[in-house]
Amino acid sequence: NPNSIDSKYALKPFDMTWVDGGRYAILGPSGCGKSTMLNIMSGIVKPSEGRLLFDGVDVTDETTSDRNIAQVFQFPVIYGTMTVYDNLAFPLVCRGYDKAFIRSKVNEVAEALSLENLLPMSAKKLTADQKQLISLGRGLVRDNVAAILMDEPLTVIDPDLKFRLRRKLKEINQKYQSTLIYVTHDQNEAMTFAENIIVMDEGEIVQVGSPAELFDRPKTTFVGYFIGAPAM
């Protein structure tokens, strides 16, 4: 609440360009502003100052539904009374697409996510990682999605499955050329997933760079220790 006398801004001023089709991680400790940045992009939170542009168009005042953004939250959001197929089809059904198109897109995305054998199953019977894949799949079925925003999406996933899911996310990025923005406080997740990492601390972007750049040339002591760079 920046209008309060004693309050601090959740995010300090910054100017950031996200390249279409890129794979990003927003990395930093809890409470540093990562989720706030993500929620401003999706439209859940409106910034008190500044503007947000999509391909040069100002969308700061646009609703979430008008931004063509998909968001995957920390805990899977699924419809337990529906089948896996119906969960994946739901965004298209709501937008009035015909059944043949819906079937084609759902089957395509289910195959990409290795969910094709689960389509007839009740979604409530799935494991946590399978439910999170459904959340991701609902973003992928829409052709007009500009970016998929993920807020610590692997928190509820067993450690032995995390690497497999990060690899699957990379495959999705390459197949669909979707912009993926991934919030995490886990250095290993960021370093093994992203092409570019945005390191944050106390509402400020401290450094932006590839995993190799951050590891070899950290700009600050904070970045060095947080990344685990040998130079520090």
Which residues fall in each region the model found?
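Helix-to-loop junction immediately C-terminal to a conserved catalytic motif
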Residues: S42
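Conserved ABC ATPase "signature" region
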Residues: D58, V93, A100-L118, K170-E171
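Conserved ABC ATPase "signature" C-loop
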Residues: T127, E202-G203
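The feature captures the beta-strand-to-loop junction immediately N-terminal to the Walker
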Residues: L27-P29
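ABC ATPase NBD coupling module
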Residues: D58-A70, F75, C94, K99-R103, ...
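ABC ATPase "signature
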Residues: V208-G209, R217
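Short coil-to-helix segment of the ABC ATPase nucleotide-binding domain corresponding to the Q-loop/switch region
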Residues: M82-P91, S122
